[in-house]
Regions:
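PLP-dependent amino-acid enzyme catalytic core
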Residues: 1-502
C-alpha cells in the first residue's frame, strides 16, 4: 500500500514515510492509492473480534510495511484497560429524545477525555516505528495546532517518548478553561505549550507554514531533527479513526439493533473534517453508510459548502461553547475533494491555492452533486446547543458535552427535513466535564454558578450524578507549568528557540 500527495501526483511514499513526514513537501496531504474492500464475509469475521482485533485487521490492510508483530505491539500498548477503562475503548450508549433512539458512540473514555485519544494513544507507537524504518537516528519534532482537545491528547500521547519533542500552539481565548488547564499542567521532559494571539485557523496556518518553510527544515536537518505532525493532516492520526466506525457497526449488529448489511447514518460534530472523513473512508471499504450528517456550530462554513459547493472562509469568526469546532479552514476536506476529483492532484492544488489566495473556491457540478447525494450539512448556535443538552438530560438523564449536543441537534434537523429514520450513530467527542460551565448553564437554572472551573465540575456532578472522569478530577491540584503567549508571526522563531536552534 503506497500513498500519494493530494497536490502532487509524482510524490509517492510508503505508509511509514507518510506517518513520519506528516505532510507532503508540497503542502499536500497523504492519501492511500487504494482502499481495501471488505466483503460481507470479512464483516462477519470482524463481528467475532474485540476492538483490538478489529483495529489490527484494519491497520494491517493499510500499513503494509509494518510487520504483524509491530502492529500487534502498537495496538496492545495503545488500547489498554488502564488507559480507556474497559476492553472496549469506544462503547455505544443508548438514549431517547423526542421518540427517537440515539446510538451514541462515546469516544471520550481515554486519558484526556476526548475522541482524540483514540488516535493519539496509538500515533506515538506508529511514529517511532516509522522513524526507525525511514529516518533512523533522527528526532521527530511534533508541531500541533489545537482548538482544544488535540493539544492535550497529543501531549499525553507523546510525553517522554524517546526521540520526539512536541510543541503545541493554541488560541489564547479559543479553548475552554479545562482544556487550557489540561495543557498548561502537562508533565513530560519533551513537551512545550504556547498560546497564540489569534484563533485556531491562525495557529493551523502558522504550523503549516513552518512545516513547508525550507530554511526552517534545513536548520532542523542540521540538528538531526525533522518535523512531523500529530494533527489529523497526518495519516497516522486519521487511520485509527476509521476503526471505531467499523467497530460501532459490528457492536450494533451484535446488540441486535441492526442486521448485518443494514445501512446506517453517521452524525459527526465537525471542525477539521477528519472525524467525518474517517467514516467516509470506512464506507469506501464497504461499511454500509447511507448518509454522512455533518454538524457545525455558528462557524458554519462546512454546512454552507455542502449546500452550495462554494467554500468561503471570508466570514465572521465566532467563539462558541463548542470551541473544538471553531474552525473556518477544514484541512481534511482536501482529502475528500481529491477523492471526488478522481484522485486528481492538479484539481486539488488549484482549489487549495484559491483558498490560500482569495479565501474561497467553488467545486465542479459533478463534485457538488456527489457531495449532496452523500452528505447533509446543518448547524446550530450556542442557545440551541444548550437547549439540546437540557432536552437530552431531562428526557433520559443522559449528559452530553457541547459538541455532541451540536450533533444531536443537527441530527434532529435532518430527520425533520428528510423523514429518514435510518438507524444512526452519533459521534460523542468529549466528556461533558471538559465544558462544565456551558453544560451546567444548560441543565441548571444558570444562576449562582461557581466561578472556579473545578467547583463547576463538582456542581455539575451534584446536578447530574454523571461520574467525573478520574483524569479531570486529578487536575484540580495541579500547578501550571506553561504560560507563554506569542504573536502568530513569531511562531517560527518560538519553535527554533524551544528547540535551542540558532
Amino acid at each position: 500500500m503506497l500513498y500519494n500527495s493530494t497536490q502532487n501526483a509524482a510524490e509517492v511514499v510508503s505508509a511509514a514515510q507518510a506517518i513520519a513526514q506528516g505532510i507532503s513537501k508540497d503542502g499536500g496531504l497523504f492519501v492511500p492509492q487504494e482502499f481495501p474492500k471488505y466483503s460481507a464475509e470479512t464483516f462477519n469475521e470482524l463481528l467475532k473480534l474485540d476492538y483490538k482485533g478489529r483495529a489490527k485487521k484494519v491497520f494491517a490492510d493499510f500499513l503494509s510495511d509494518f510487520t504483524e508483530e509491530e502492529i500487534n505491539d502498537c495496538v496492545e500498548n495503545a488500547y489498554t484497560k488502564e488507559k480507556f477503562g474497559s476492553d472496549n475503548p469506544a462503547p455505544l450508549a443508548y438514549a431517547k429524545l423526542n421518540g427517537k433512539e440515539l446510538n451514541i458512540l462515546e469516544l471520550w473514555h481515554g486519558p484526556t477525555c476526548a475522541f482524540k485519544d483514540m488516535a493519539l494513544q496509538i500515533l506515538p507507537h506508529f511514529l517511532t516505528k516509522s522513524l526507525k524504518k525511514t529516518y533512523d537516528g533522527k528526532d521527530a519534532v511534533i508541531l500541533v495546532a489545537t482548538s482544544g482537545d488535540t493539544g492535550k491528547a497529543a501531549l499525553e500521547g507523546f510525553k517522554d517518548v524517546d526521540h520526539t519533542k512536541i510543541i503545541v500552539f493554541y488560541p489564547v481565548d479559543g479553548v475552554s478553561p479545562m482544556q487550557k488547564h489540561q495543557m498548561n499542567t502537562q508533565e513530560g521532559n519533551n513537551v512545550t505549550v504556547c498560546a497564540i494571539k489569534g484563533n485556531f485557523d491562525d495557529a493551523q496556518t502558522g504550523v503549516k507554514k513552518i512545516f513547508t518553510t525550507p530554511e526552517i527544515s534545513a536548520k532542523l536537518e542540521a540538528n538531526n531533527m525533522l518535523f512531523s505532525s500529530a494533527n489529523s493532516i497526518n495519516w497516522g492520526r486519521l487511520l485509527p479513526q476509521i476503526v471505531y466506525y467499523i467497530s460501532a457497526y459490528c457492536d450494533l449488529v451484535n446488540a441486535g439493533k441492526i442486521a448485518m448489511g443494514d445501512k446506517i447514518n453517521v452524525v459527526v460534530p465537525t471542525g477539521n473534517f477528519g472525524n467525518i472523513l474517517a467514516s467516509y473512508y470506512a464506507s469506501i471499504m464497504g461499511l454500509p453508510i447511507n448518509k454522512f450528517i455533518c454538524a457545525s456550530n455558528s462557524n458554519n462554513v462546512l454546512s454552507d459548502f455542502i449546500k452550495t459547493g462554494v467554500y468561503d472562509k471570508n466570514r465572521h469568526f465566532y467563539t462558541t461553547i463548542s470551541p473544538s469546532m471553531d474552525i473556518l479552514v477544514s484541512s481534511n476536506l482536501e482529502r475528500l475533494l481529491y477523492k471526488l476529483a478522481g484522485n486528481n492532484a492538479d484539481t486539488t492544488k488549484e482549489l487549495m491555492t484559491a483558498l490560500k489566495t482569495v479565501g474561497k473556491y467553488e467545486v465542479s457540478d459533478e463534485i457538488k452533486a456527489e457531495i449532496k447525494s452523500k452528505f447533509f450539512g446543518g448547524f446550530c448556535d450556542d442557545e440551541q446547543t444548550k437547549a439540546t443538552i437540557k432536552a437530552l438530560f431531562d428526557t433520559d438523564k443522559y449528559l452530553c458535552d457541547t459538541h455532541t449536543a451540536v450533533a444531536v441537534n443537527v441530527y434532529e434537523q435532518y430527520v425533520e427535513q428528510t423523514g429518514d429514520t435510518t438507524p444512526s450513530v452519533i459521534a460523542s467527542t468529549a466528556s461533558p466535564y471538559k465544558f462544565s460551565k456551558a453544560v451546567l448553564e444548560a441543565v441548571s437554572d444558570g444562576t449562582d454558578l461557581p466561578e472556579n472551573e473545578f467547583d463547576m465540575v463538582e456542581k455539575l456532578f451534584e446536578v447530574s450524578n454523571a461520574p467525573v472522569p478520574a483524569p479531570l478530577a486529578a487536575l484540580k491540584d495541579k500547578k501550571a507549568r506553561f504560560s507563554d503567549v506569542t504573536e502568530v508571526n513569531s511562531m517560527p522563531q518560538y519553535v527554533l528557540d524551544a528547540l535551542n536552534i540558532k
